Amino acid sequence: PIAGSMVLAAILLKLGGYGIIRMMQILPTTKTDLFLPFIVLALWGAILANLTCLQQTDLKSLIAYSSISHMGLVVAAIIIQSPWGLSGAMALMIAHGFTSSALFCLANTTYERTHTRILILTRGFHNILPMATTWWLLANLMNIATPPTLNFTSELLIMSTLFNWCPTTIILLGLSMLITASYSLHMFLSSQMGPTPLNNQTEPTHSREHLLMTLHLAPLMMISMKPELII
């Protein structure tokens, strides 16, 4: 069910990050060097989740693994226990909550018309449903964290925090962001571009789908213009 996936990605997954923030406040303040294994594990987990995304053929699985990779960055930022890290982690949780939920919604829109979630079988929608393709492009650009979105602000804060803590982490972060951009563009091109299947009786998009996407992306864009609301 699509509603379950949207709630899971947008809210329940972020409760784990919220729990870590709360636990860090009651733990005695220790040197972050003690948390080095956990930070490396979080970043390495983010890279592995991104690599798993690259080899996914199922649209829904790809979006789910994408959420896991972003949570790796959140965990690493929280564990460092700096103000910038906490701000970046909270901003990324909110931004990715909107983005991943929107992507799940779009995946369901595609599934209702093609009855398949295999990437290569859902291609050619840019000719049939240009508005849906526009929503896909916007959601993927936010997933990549292009400026001036909140995703970009939050990832910049997390990157600054990790680089200030240990400059070597920029290699892992850079690799993670490169793979994120790769699979996001791959997902967009595979599901929207290419030749349109013959004898395709596709019903047009409904107003409720456009409304749902607007309610996902409009708040995110508005928060992006005034990030001090949450940072």
From Swiss-Prot:
<dbReference type="Pfam" id="PF00361">
    <property type="entry name" value="Proton_antipo_M"/>
</dbReference>
<feature type="transmembrane region" description="Helical">
    <location>
        <begin position="169"/>
        <end position="189"/>
    </location>
</feature>
<keyword id="KW-0249">Electron transport</keyword>
<dbReference type="GO" id="GO:0031966">
    <property type="term" value="C:mitochondrial membrane"/>
</dbReference>
<keyword id="KW-0679">Respiratory chain</keyword>
<dbReference type="InterPro" id="IPR003918">
    <property type="entry name" value="NADH_UbQ_OxRdtase"/>
</dbReference>
<feature type="transmembrane region" description="Helical">
    <location>
        <begin position="34"/>
        <end position="54"/>
    </location>
</feature>
<comment type="function">
    <text>Core subunit of the mitochondrial membrane respiratory chain NADH dehydrogenase (Complex I) that is believed to belong to the minimal assembly required for catalysis. Complex I functions in the transfer of electrons from NADH to the respiratory chain. The immediate electron acceptor for the enzyme is believed to be ubiquinone.</text>
</comment>
<keyword id="KW-1133">Transmembrane helix</keyword>
<keyword id="KW-0830">Ubiquinone</keyword>
<keyword id="KW-0496">Mitochondrion</keyword>
<keyword id="KW-0520">NAD</keyword>
<feature type="transmembrane region" description="Helical">
    <location>
        <begin position="128"/>
        <end position="148"/>
    </location>
</feature>
<protein>
    <recommendedName>
        <fullName>NADH-ubiquinone oxidoreductase chain 4</fullName>
        <ecNumber>7.1.1.2</ecNumber>
    </recommendedName>
</protein>
<feature type="transmembrane region" description="Helical">
    <location>
        <begin position="84"/>
        <end position="106"/>
    </location>
</feature>
<feature type="transmembrane region" description="Helical">
    <location>
        <begin position="1"/>
        <end position="21"/>
    </location>
</feature>
<keyword id="KW-0812">Transmembrane</keyword>
<comment type="similarity">
    <text>Belongs to the complex I subunit 4 family.</text>
</comment>
<feature type="transmembrane region" description="Helical">
    <location>
        <begin position="61"/>
        <end position="80"/>
    </location>
</feature>
<dbReference type="GO" id="GO:0042773">
    <property type="term" value="P:ATP synthesis coupled electron transport"/>
</dbReference>
<keyword id="KW-0472">Membrane</keyword>
<keyword id="KW-0813">Transport</keyword>
<dbReference type="GO" id="GO:0048039">
    <property type="term" value="F:ubiquinone binding"/>
</dbReference>
<dbReference type="InterPro" id="IPR001750">
    <property type="entry name" value="ND/Mrp_TM"/>
</dbReference>
<keyword id="KW-1278">Translocase</keyword>
<dbReference type="GO" id="GO:0008137">
    <property type="term" value="F:NADH dehydrogenase (ubiquinone) activity"/>
</dbReference>
<dbReference type="GO" id="GO:0015990">
    <property type="term" value="P:electron transport coupled proton transport"/>
</dbReference>
